[in-house]
A protein has these predicted regions:
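A short beta-loop-alpha structural element at the N-terminal edge
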Residues: 1-4, 106-117
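N-terminal charged segments
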Residues: 1-68, 72-77, 119-123, 127-132
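A conserved beta-strand-loop-helix scaffold within acyl/acetyltransferase catalytic domains
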Residues: 38, 127-165
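Conserved acetyl-CoA-binding loop-helix of GNAT-fold acetyltransferases
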Residues: 51-59, 163, 169-183, 198-206
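Conserved GNAT acetyl-CoA-binding A-motif
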Residues: 61-73, 184-196, 215
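Conserved active-site alpha-helix within GNAT-family acetyltransferase domains
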Residues: 73-84, 195-213
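Conserved catalytic-core motifs of GNAT/GCN5-like acyltransferases
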Residues: 85-98, 192, 210-226
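A structural microfeature
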Residues: 146-148, 173, 213
């Protein structure tokens, strides 16, 4: 079965390892195709060594609104079809972290007074409000002033890292990541970075995070929901 062939300890499949650590369904697991569905994040993780018509028909039948795969050919094929009208499509690199977590009292649940600022600096107000309501949005405060923020996404990854412009290049980004790894240590953590986000990639490299050899390809309509 294909699932048994994946190196789940590799950064390439950290997203699948996260799905397996929670509530999920195995939709398909053959020698050349795998479809997992997370009951938590509602994402379909699809892997295949052979893109056949039966696999495509299965995906059309499932009609996923949130799909991820490391197969770039499948990504391109699904990007061009009309049966699954994905609104958003992008590729990212995936990282796993060494033992750098450090408890930091500066990181705490985002204060409600700072929620409008976060909404203004993130692409989706609805998703930010969901993260906030589920205590998955953390602020980094120095002398009660918000320096930056980070999120624990519903798929298990940490991301949406943001440092206010006036506080950049002062080491806060690294401090926020390390603090988040400690704060969310009860689940397998990883991060995903859009392939052209060179600033974030350099940050992960400076933290000696292990980088995937493949790209994680995302297709989605309305994104995560709780």
């Amino acid at each position: 079965m294909l699932l048994d062939q994946l190196s789940l300890c590799s950064p390439d499949y950290a997203h699948i390892n996260a799905i397996l650590s929670g509530s999920y369904e195995t939709i398909l697991n053959t020698n050349n195709a795998l479809i997992l569905y997370s009951n938590i994040s509602h994402v379909y993780a699809v892997e295949t060594t052979n893109i056949c018509e039966s696999l495509l028909q299965k995906l059309y039948q499932l009609s996923p609104r949130l799909l991820e795969t490391t197969n770039e050919t499948l990504f391109q094929q699904l990007s061009c079809q009309n049966q699954l009208p994905f609104e958003h499509k992008y590729k990212c690199l995936q990282f796993t972290f060494p033992d750098i977590a450090g408890k930091d009292s500066h990181l705490e649940p985002l204060h409600s007074a700072d929620l409008p600022y976060v909404i203004d600096t993130y692409e989706s107000e609805a998703y930010i409000r969901q993260l906030f309501s589920h205590n998955r949005l953390m602020g980094y405060y120095v002398n009660s002033v918000l320096i930056g923020y980070i999120a624990h996404h519903i798929d298990g990854s940490i991301g949406a890292l943001y440092v206010k412009p006036e506080y950049r290049n002062k080491g806060y980004a690294s401090a926020i990541v390390k603090a988040a790894l400690s704060a969310f240590a009860d689940s397998p953590l990883f991060s995903q970075v859009i392939e052209d986000n060179t600033v974030s990639i350099r940050l992960h490299e400076a933290l000696h995070a292990a980088k995937s050899d493949v790209k994680i390809c995302w297709l989605y309509d309305d994104g995560f929901s709780f």
